[in-house]
């Protein structure tokens, strides 16, 4: 299944990201960023830091 991060500007002028897998949105930023680079930095954090994150039941 192909996965793609998308960066986009919302209607308020803030930058956001979403992760698509097989055409479905499986994750999103949940918040807007003032700059495109801020949203891109958040994507890099998710890509680099979550691969071995534990799953905790709440």
Q: Model-predicted segments: where are they?
A:
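Short aromatic-glycine-(Arg/Gly/Cys) micro-motifs in beta-strand/loop hairpins
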Residues: 8-27
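A short, exposed loop/beta-hairpin motif centered on an aromatic-Gly-Thr core
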Residues: 25-35
């Amino acid at each position: 299944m192909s996965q793609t991060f998308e960066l986009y500007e919302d209607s308020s002028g803030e930058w956001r990201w979403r992760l698509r897998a097989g055409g479905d949105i499986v994750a999103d930023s949940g918040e807007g960023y003032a700059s495109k680079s801020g949203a891109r930095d958040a994507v890099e954090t998710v890509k680099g830091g979550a691969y071995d994150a534990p799953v905790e039941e709440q």
